[in-house]
Structure formats: C-alpha cells, structure tokens
Regions:
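N-terminal Rossmann-like NAD(P)+-binding subdomain of aldehyde/semialdehyde dehydrogenases
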Residues: 1-104
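Rossmann-like NAD(P) dinucleotide-binding subdomain of oxidoreductase/dehydrogenase enzymes
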Residues: 96-232, 358
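Residue-level signal for inorganic ion chemistry
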Residues: 34, 80, 137, 168, ...
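Conserved C-terminal structural/oligomerization subdomain of aldehyde/semialdehyde dehydrogenase
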Residues: 2-3, 321, 325-445
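Short, well-ordered beta-strand elements within core beta-sheets of diverse protein domains
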Residues: 21-28, 115, 222-224, 254-257, ...
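Short loop/edge segments at beta-strand edges and connector loops
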Residues: 91, 172, 193, 314-316
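ALDH superfamily catalytic-core signature
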Residues: 6-8, 197-337, 401
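Structural signal for hydrophobic packing residues in well-ordered secondary-structure cores
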Residues: 23, 27, 42-45, 49, ...
Length: 445
C-alpha cells in the first residue's frame, strides 16, 4: 500500500492565502449568503448520516451507533439549524449610548479561521466550529484529528462536495501536518485537544499574534450534596460517564459523595449499569477505547491503583470477559484513591470513576480550588445556600446543576474553559462573536 501524500507547510499556506484573497476581493457575505453556506453543511450531514456513523465506528473499532447519531449528526444539525435561524439578528449593529452623535458596534468577519478538532466526537466538533465561523462570514480551514483517519477522510470528501477550496478547506495528516497548520497566520484559531498540545499550539500562534480559543478539558468534578436525591443523582452521573465510554472532555471525572453514602452510591451504580448495559462483551452499544495507547494508559491507572491497595469495583454483568483486543474496559469505580496516583492527576478520559468521600462542603471546595480550573463542574442537591456556595466559590468553564454536561450541549450558552481548561468560548452568539471583529464606529453629530 502506498503512503498517503500530505500537504507540506507551503501548500497549507497557499490555501490560506487563496482564502484570504477571496475574502478581500468581495464584500462580506450577507446574512442570506451565510445562511446558504450553512444550509450546505446541513445537507451534508443529512445525506451522509449513515456513512459518518460507520466511519466513526470503524475508527473506534466499536462505537455506540446510537451515541454516534446523537453526538455527531443530530447535535451538530441542531446547532447549524439554530445558527441559520438566528444569524441575521446577531449581525445587526449594536447602538451604544453617547452624549452626542451616534455610536455603534459592527460585527465584521475576521477573515480566515483555522479549526483543529479532537478525535472523541469528530464530526460534532467540525460542524459546530464551522457553524460559528460561517455565521460570522469567515473562510475556514479545518484540521481534523489524525486518530480518526476514516472519519477525517470522509469529512474532507464531504466538504469538498459542498464548498470551493477558497470557502472551506480540509487539511488532513499526521502530527507534523497539524504542527504546520498551527503555525499559519490565521485570523483566529480554534483548538480542541489535550492541554499538553494546547501549550504548543499557543506558542505557535503567538509567533503570528493569532488570537486563539482553546478548549482543553481537565478533571471535571461532580458533587453530590446531602440534600440530593441520591438515586437520581447516581443514575444521571453514571449515564453521563457511560457516554462514549467516558471519552468526552466534559465527562464527570471524579465524584464527591457524603462519606455515609458511599456504599449506597456503589449499589445504585451497579443497578444503573446493569439496566443500561445488560452485557458488555457482545454489546455494540458499549464503546471501545479509541486506540491501544489510550487503552494501555487506562489499564495503567487501574494497575497502579490496584498496587496501592485501592478497592476497584467493576460494574456490569458478572463474568463478562472482555477481550483486550477489542479495547473494551468495564465501567469501574475506585474507592478513595490517593491523590498521588495518576488517575487523580490526569484527565481520565475513560470509564473509570474515582469516589471521594467527604464530610463537609468546605473541604470539597478547598480540594477543587487547589487544582487547575476544570472545564465543567456538576452539583446535585436541593439546598439553595449550598448551590450558591458552589457557584460563587469555585471557578470552572461551566456548571450543570442536577445533571452532567448539559451546559456544554446548549447553543444558548458559551462553551469554553478557564485557566488550565482553556480560554475563550464558542457556541451560539458567543461563537459568532468569537469569530467576528467587534468594530467600534462613531459618527459625529
């Protein structure tokens, strides 16, 4: 089999320059023209739904078709349709009060936006990023993850059907292609991925003073209050953790449980997994770990915890032998692992859930605040005073109360991190503004 040929840095730069020249040669796209380009993306997702689900499944080895349809087809479709419906309103100049004359803000396209996406929900990130960038009137260059080769190749073919290269272009290839991509003088760069890579992206962008939005993830804590309905809370936490086998940047990473409720948490969790996944070994709805590297990483966490004497509790059908070749890992609870273990240092990104027993809320808040600021934080309870303590005394990219991850799915809320979990935000009007220049205009009276 011949080795694929990838674009070198000069070829990537040439695409950018063609896109920039096309943007400068004409007036910015009108609301109607932007809407028509968004309609093309909608049409692509509708026509290629089955192919996308199959390609993503092939890249994972095994991936829940139900989850793929919701996360990588229906969710970006909803984003595109909502963007299409609202973009004309977003584009309107905003009057600002002045003592005399007139003042307003106009939202102007930046020019060429670069988007680098991760592997865990590949089509979701491509089309959601595309929605905001096109709504703002930009040309777009995309670098999908090299860890989804079949999906990335399909997305490149799909977008080439619908867009001229000077409108939307896809650059595929291994890590060195991604590095060359991030060195380009974009007008804005959106990167989704690991914090370790995000640091390199930020350095590369700084050479050209490219503004960057980073969505990096982190260890998103979950807190169950003594005021919570425990059965409801555990059901929602476990259901969220099972999505994509925990391979989501906003997945609940570890959970604080009142110390007297830990045993009850474990028993409820067992029942929830048995109900949602009666079997694991032969269940196409249970997602595999993407590749061997991540599988070994997660097994390493378990081996280290086991060696440290941590109680590990596998959830699922008893005696369900999982073939390592399929890269399936049973949902596993870890009872109070020491903070020195890697499972409590790294973003888990898998179906492992450490349980942290606690006595008082202050110790929970202190623990969270002593660590890098997470992308998400989840609190379950009915005590308004405690809810306010969580909201006021912790800092995270977003918060979902009495559920997990929902803040990240809503187009009406900005999605992004803070501190170690990222910078900037997109989705909905916030994405439109991220990918626009807010130009101040004053007319003398």
């Amino acid at each position: 089999m011949s080795t694929p040929e990838y674009l070198d840095e000069a070829a990537i730069r040439a695409i950018l320059e063609r896109q920039r020249a096309a943007a400068l040669a004409h007036e910015p796209w009108s609301a109607e023209q932007r809407g028509e380009r968004i309609d093309r993306a909608i049409d692509l997702l509708v026509r290629h739904e089955r192919a996308l689900i199959e390609a993503i499944g092939a890249d994972f080895g095994q991936r829940s078709p139900t989850f793929s349809r919701h996360s990588d087809v229906l969710s970006p479709l909803a984003t595109l349709k909502q963007t299409r419906a609202e973009l004309a309103g977003w584009m309107q100049p905003e009057p600002r009060p002045v003592p005399r004359g007139q003042a307003w803000v106009e939202y102007q396209p930046l020019g060429v936006v670069g988007i680098v996406t991760a592997w865990n929900v590949p089509a979701n990130m491509v089309f959601k990023g595309l929605a905001g960038a096109l709504a703002a009137g930009n040309r777009v260059m995309l670098k999908p993850s090299e860890f989804n080769p079949q999906t990335s190749a399909l997305i490149a073919r799909m977008l080439a059907e619908a867009y001229a290269e000077d409108e939307v272009a896809v650059v595929n290839g291994p890590a060195e292609v991604g590095q060359a991509f991030c060195r380009q003088p974009f007008d804005h760069l959106l990167f989704t991925g690991a914090a370790s890579i995000g640091r390199h992206v930020l350095r590369a962008a700084a050479e050209n003073l490219v503004p960057v939005t980073l969505e990096l993830g982190g260890k998103s804590p979950t807190i169950i209050s003594r005021s919570a309905d425990l059965a409801s809370a555990v059901g929602r936490i476990i259901a969220g953790k099972l999505m994509n086998a925990g391979q989501l940047c906003v997945a609940p990473d570890y959970v604080f449980v009142p110390q007297e409720s830990v045993d009850a948490f474990v028993e409820i969790a067992r029942k929830v997994v048995s109900r949602l996944l009666p079997s694991l070994a032969d269940n196409p709805e249970y997602t595999a770990i993407l590749n061997q590297r991540h599988y070994q990483r997660l097994q390493g966490y378990l081996d280290e915890a086991r060696g440290a004497g941590v109680e590990l509790m596998e959830l699922g059908a008893a005696g369900d032998a999982l073939d390592p070749a399929l890269r399936l890992i049973a949902p596993t609870l870890l009872r109070d692992p020491p903070d020195r273990l890697q499972v409590m240092q790294d973003e888990i990104f898998g179906p492992l859930l450490p349980i942290k027993p606690y006595r008082e809320l202050d110790e929970v808040i202190g623990y969270i605040n002593a660590r890098p600021r997470p992308l998400g934080l989840y609190w379950f309870g009915s005590d308004p005073a405690e809810e306010q303590q969580i909201l006021r005394r912790t800092c995270s990219g977003g918060v979902t109360l009495n559920e997990v991850m929902h803040h990240a799915a809503l187009e009406s809320l900005p999605f992004g991190g803070v501190g170690g979990s990222g910078m900037g935000a997109y989705h909905g009007i916030d994405g439109f503004r991220t990918f626009s220049h807010a130009k101040a205009v004053y007319r003398a009276g």
